[in-house]
């Protein structure tokens, strides 16, 4: 299986590093390319033991899966450049935010299968939650192979393309939303009189430990919460205060704003 990666930004690097480290693919069958920084590309390719090239004919020849990881505003120029070299065997996997499958096919001037994936930055540690949507001309074997590739850097949720907006909001942007919540927790903890460094380190370990509890337990998060909440205790006192605020509405507004922006970005013709 030959894989080609167009674009070598942070997300693309996290993805193909995960694939290289977690699959049985031969490094000689993996090709990287970027827009222009050959020195950085060469160094990264040599570090991973894979190939790099700027020759589109070489890259696309016999390529099974072609990852489109360029910045969205660079895609039209990339499509113009590579479309003369596309073969019938190329399946495209886009990690570009906001660019619909139909637009990708239109710019590439082909009817090759196209999948869109929406990972998050946790791909860097092999724990992305990645939404994926397929064009209707994928065969089952190719779908399975792509799912296996994506699972190399986390878990997969297959949805319709329209629902990628919701996945973008919930899991794509999710790490940033959680970081923001944790930031506020640190600020509040510091106001109790502890040193900021102590609070930050404590909360980092609190997050790690709580995540492991969720990972290793078959219980719901609600049940895990109940298990550590004693009637009349300190935890109950804090939760009673939290329940005075409509946290659900706050998060609904947050997620809806992200969904709306994702939809706006996908309206290519309006830009």
UniProtKB/Swiss-Prot annotation:
Alphabetized, the UniProt keywords read: Amino-acid biosynthesis, Cytoplasm, NADP, Oxidoreductase, Proline biosynthesis
Matches recorded under Gene3D superfamilies? NAD(P)-binding Rossmann-like Domain, ProC C-terminal domain-like
* Pathway noted in the entry: Amino-acid biosynthesis; L-proline biosynthesis; L-proline from L-glutamate 5-semialdehyde: step 1/1
One Pfam match? P5CR_dimer
- Its main subcellular localisation, reduced to a broad class, is cytoplasm
Q: A Gene Ontology CC term for this entry?
A: cytoplasm
The EC category is oxidoreductase
Q: What is its EC number?
A: 1.5.1.2
Q: Which domain of life is it from?
A: Bacteria
Q: What's the catalysed reaction?
A: L-proline + NADP(+) = (S)-1-pyrroline-5-carboxylate + NADPH + 2 H(+); L-proline + NAD(+) = (S)-1-pyrroline-5-carboxylate + NADH + 2 H(+)
Example of a GO MF term = pyrroline-5-carboxylate reductase activity
Record-stated family: Belongs to the pyrroline-5-carboxylate reductase family.
Entry protein name:
Pyrroline-5-carboxylate reductase
Q: What is the lineage of its organism?
A: Bacteria, Bacillati, Bacillota, Bacilli, Bacillales
- Give the gene that encodes this protein: proC
